[in-house]
Amino acid sequence: MHEIQLKNYEITGILGTGADYEVRSAVALDTGETVVLKRPIPQVITRDMHAPIEARTESIIETYRDLFESTNTLCPLIGYTSKCNHNELYNDGIMQNYTVLVFERAPGIPLVGDARSRILRIPIGIPQNLFTLYPLFQLDDSSCWSVQAALLETERKFFESGRILLDLGPQNIHYQPATGQITIIDLGDQVMVGDEKVGNRGRKRDIYDFYIEILKYYTISADPPKSIDGYKEPHGLRPVIGLDQEMNEMIRTVESPEVSCNKLKINMINKIKDFEYDDFSHFMVDLTEYLQEVRIRYRDNPELASYQAIWFESLQLLKADHWRKYDFEAETELSKFDK
């Protein structure tokens, strides 16, 4: 990671715009390498209101310095520019100074695709459902929960370094089916331990927000879908509301609360509501136990063969042209699932 001159790059397209950053694809003119450029949203820059985003950018750079070598889940940051005018590259007339981050292109596909693709009837929730909620391809051991395990391990390292990484929803996680590896593409939402900030609803954002995200996005209390349509829609993407309301909604949607795995989930929810997790490892233990019970329930379901047939049919949707816009070769990535 080093300071970069953008004269070595040429923009090739717009990938999207988030709450703080505009994201574009670019190519290195000397090597042909495809990269991703992130800068503050242009409208915010032109109003000279981008100082908070610049502070967030500095925090991201510092995080990479401290943690990148000890993790294998962060999208590599090639470098960053000095805080200056970048009109020569962007050619948009913006003369204010700002920093641009230059990332490697994340491998794999997002667990949930771009919401705008829904207009084109793209089943953007397919990866999340196939690989995190209903991983019916590998039920013999806990490796089927590789996404959850990687997120827990990443957060543990952040927490030990005095940071809490949030906004870990499936749209910010790329996944490689062939290896089970994840890549986190957004480190913008961090809270320092001991310096937790009050959120929009009056409660300080802390490690419990991470616990909520894990249960909200990466667990589900339902049997596997009985049709392909059940795999198409993303799960849990409604914005997080207040803690109590969020937890009550999760309990309300638990199907068959008398089932052992669902009892464990309700127990976790109640512990979060009552702030009973006094150590991060205790949440890890409870979640691991819960996922183990879910795996056994899937594995021992008498209708498993039927559910798996639907799962494999749904997997074929990832061979559509839409997913080729990512760093993803379907024939290679999905070959291990061939019957």
Model-derived features: positions:
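Conserved structural core of kinase catalytic domains
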Residues: 76-139
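Catalytic-loop of the protein kinase fold
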Residues: 155-176
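C-lobe/activation-segment region of protein kinase-like
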Residues: 182-265, 282
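ATP-binding glycine-rich phosphate-binding loop
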Residues: 3-30
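ATP-binding glycine-rich loop module of kinase domains
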Residues: 20-73
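Terminal C-lobe "cap" of eukaryotic-type protein kinase domains
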Residues: 271-297
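Regulatory extensions appended to serine/threonine kinase catalytic cores
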Residues: 295-339
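Activation segment signature within eukaryotic-like protein kinase domains
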Residues: 147-148
